[in-house]
Amino acid sequence: YAPDITIGPDGKYYLYYVLDHLPIVSVAVCDTPAGEFEFHGYVHYADGTKLGEKEGDEPSFDPGVITEGDKTYLYLGFCGPGDTSRTGSFVSVLDKDMVTIIENPKLVAPGCMNKEFAPDFNEHPFFEAPSIRKRNGKYYFVYSSAAMHELCYAMSDSPVGPFTYGGVIVSNCDLGIDTYKDGKTPVAPGANNHGSIIEIGDEWYIFYHRHTNNTWYCRQGCAEKISFNEDGTINQVEITSCGLNGGPLVGKGKYPAYIACHVYKKDMGVYIGQSEVPFIKQDGADGDKRLSFVHNVTENSGIGFKYFEFNGVKKVRVFARGYGMGFIEIRTSMDGEVLGKAQVHHTNHWQVYDIDAAIPDGVSPLYITYSGGGSIEIQEFELV
């Protein structure tokens, strides 16, 4: 489950992972991060007992690691709602051999069944996916909360805590963002979330995932640029289609529909698995070169892309198929004015719909919505 990697004191790369249905942590080692890794050993106490098998241990899950000097800090945990046998995420300190525990597990973030430990976590208790980062002398504990769709963080001056809850970094359905909608309204199907923050050049990003195929088990990797306040805290970022682009996307040319950050239907619920909502899917197997597309776009639903730098766009060319009896519409906000539309035709082959739509110059979103009966699929679009 959700392995993590660190560079040991010897300069080698150590991969920490937990196998399905086993309570212990395995470690593999390699001279390069790309492999091939060789088995190194199991994380264990000084007496040889494996972590996870000692009386009182909680089963290991989702390892997160950071190495400083000769010490490696290993974070583990899973806390499902209603499970009183799990209390939160623990950190263990490992010796320079990368497997021997020299400081026993210590609770650093409470789960939803352990509200007395640190009340500041109670609205966003630990669920899974612990990850640790360091910036400007502060340690950032990033995790998935019991709400599942959000990645939260806590801060400390020490890798072993105590940690203070900081806030939400990102929600894969944009709950909590109220700049363009009500903060309780999802704009995509929410589900569990994994990821962390990392510095690339002079900028910091949050990596996370969202879901495809209307299931919890198909996922699409995403990234958003984040910023820090003077006190080191992080403001929640909205989900976009920009990824690592460093700014708005160029407002010309073709784009695949699967980069939509908003895949929504009016009055949809928060979590994935709902019927009659649009979702990203694919034809064929993983790895095929055929483009993914957005399936089941129906009345009062649509897909949104943030953001584009528009300049002189007069037409949007949409590639769609399906058995619809309505119109594809172009907007620059979810409920904004329809700038252009085209009537769809019954077909199971991809068709091109040229839609005259003069989009105002400047930075703004693009929304492709649908009105009418039946349903369609959207594969890509071109800004002309």
Residue ranges and their predicted role:
Residues 1-341, 345-384:
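Carbohydrate-active catalytic/glycan-binding domains of CAZyme proteins
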